[in-house]
Every structure is written in C-alpha cells, then in structure tokens.
Regions:
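Catalytic cysteine-centered active-site loop
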Residues: 39-93
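Aromatic- and glycine-rich peptidoglycan recognition patches
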Residues: 2, 16-18, 85-87, 103, ...
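Intrinsically disordered, low-complexity
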Residues: 1-39, 148-158
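Extracytoplasmic/secreted envelope proteins and their assembly/folding machinery
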Residues: 26-34, 54-58, 91, 142
Length: 158
C-alpha cells in the first residue's frame, strides 16, 4: 500500500468522524474498518455474509491489536481485564462502549470508540457502520465504557 492510499483512507474516515485527516493515525484499524464497512448485521454471524456486534469487536481486536477478547458483549463487559467507567468524557480510540438495547441483560450491544463522539459497531439496522454516542438512540441506552488493561490481559498462546 502506498502513502497515497493511506491519504485516501485518512480523508475518507476523517469525513465520517468530522476530524482532520492528520488525526487518523492507526492505519491498521481504519483498514480493518474499511474492509468490514457496510457488512450486513446477522445475530451470531462471524463473516462477511453477516456479523454481529460482539463478533466484530472480537475480530477487530484480534486483527488490529493481536488481543483475544470473549465472544459476547456480556462476556466482554464482565472481562476482568477491562477497566470500566461510566463517563464518556475521557473516551479514547480503542475503548469498548457498551449499550443495553434489548431484554433484561445488563449489556446487549458493544462498539469501539474512534474519535469525536463516533464509534464503529455492527447494528441490526445499519450493519457495520459508524455511529455517534450523542445520537439520542445510543446515548439513552449507554451502559458504560471499558478500556483494556494490558497488565491484566491473559497471555496469548502462540
């Protein structure tokens, strides 16, 4: 991939996030997002034919950060190596954001924070897409966020 390709990618996602392209630094993250963008939602899905929110997060963390996280949003929320917090003021790229969208579960949806109030997720209505935590639908369903604590992560098997 050439520098020009990165420039195009940075410009594209800077537009989605309403930030300047120079703020798009994690190229592997945005390449992953670009590869999965607009993939349809499918509950329990784990591939390009359809994917759900927690599978998207699991694949993203594995592909971009080489970090293995649990399969479901509930397991991700309760993972002991995630430092949870309620405020959205200090969100940074890579933080998981948890929502209660259905049922009696504490958590039923997960996305990953990008920048400027935007997060990547796989939603039942839009598939893999970028949404705003300030959108009334999401802000009213926000449970909290979590930052992976590298010190507490289980060691990966080779």
């Amino acid at each position: 991939t050439t520098v020009k390709d990165y420039s195009k990618l940075k410009t594209k996602y800077a537009g989605y996030l309403e930030i300047t392209p120079d703020k798009i630094i994690n190229i592997p993250l945005y390449q992953f997002i670009d590869n999965w963008m607009n993939t349809p939602y499918k509950w329990g899905g784990m591939d390009k034919r359809g994917i759900d929110c927690s599978a998207l997060m699991q694949l993203l963390f594995d592909s971009v950060y080489n970090i293995s996280i649990p399969r479901t949003s509930v397991e991700q929320f309760y993972a002991r190596w995630i430092d949870k917090f309620r405020s959205t003021q200090h969100l940074s790229e890579g933080d998981l954001i948890f929502f209660k969208t259905i049922g009696n579960n504490v958590v039923s949806h997960v996305g990953m924070y990008l920048d400027n109030g935007r997060f990547i997720n796989a939603s039942s209505s839009k598939g893999v897409s970028i949404a705003s935590i300030n959108d009334p639908y999401w802000s009213s369903r926000l449970v909290g966020a979590g930052r992976i604590n590298i010190e507490l992560l289980p060691k990966r098997r080779k």
